[in-house]
Amino acid sequence: MGFCAFIYKISFQINVLKDLLFITILGFYVLLCVYFEFTINYFHGIILLSSFALYFYYLINYHSNVDNKIDANSNSLIYSFVIILLSMLGLSIGTNLIVDNALNISKIMGVSELNIGFSIVALGTSLPELFTSLASIKRGKYDLLIGNVIGSNILNIIFVLGVSSLITNISIKSDMLEDGLFIGLIFIASHLILLLNYIFYKSLSKFSGLILLVIYIFFIYKLF
């Protein structure tokens, strides 16, 4: 989002205040779980997945826009689904390659897997989102860009953590706590910037995009 805003001024064309508040509050909840309990367990997973279900229900019932519906024949619909499935398959293969090679880099460089995950793996798995966002901007589809960014954060924090914690407890080692808290604070600060820009300006300026980029660069610097 910061990189895209630095290139183009992004206008908030839809009401995303509730969405931003939702993800910020749940991100803060995860941060509290890590700080006080050093774990995200089965109980937390149920809360996260229940929140995801409620959000999905809200999304369907209150964010639907019949004006955006277009007439499409069945062939074009099938073609679109096939392209999406093939793209997801390619992403799955690419993600596995990123993880495997990132682990090799961590061993060769003597860098912790946690820091490699926060940097190389996170950047690699975010590239599809970046390209999707840039394509959305070129087409003037700012709503798609905002939905992509907010939706990916919601899936990563709420759905992925929720499902993972149902399978096994996600424990945070004491030596990782400082990094975990730092990342949580960076996350909340970034979303607060988005919230303030939406409330006061209904847009994300190039200057705000630059601030987000500086925060990310500072984050990477602190990791290494």
What are the residue ranges of the model-derived segments?
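Hydrophobic alpha-helical segments, chiefly the membrane-spanning helices
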Residues: M1-F224
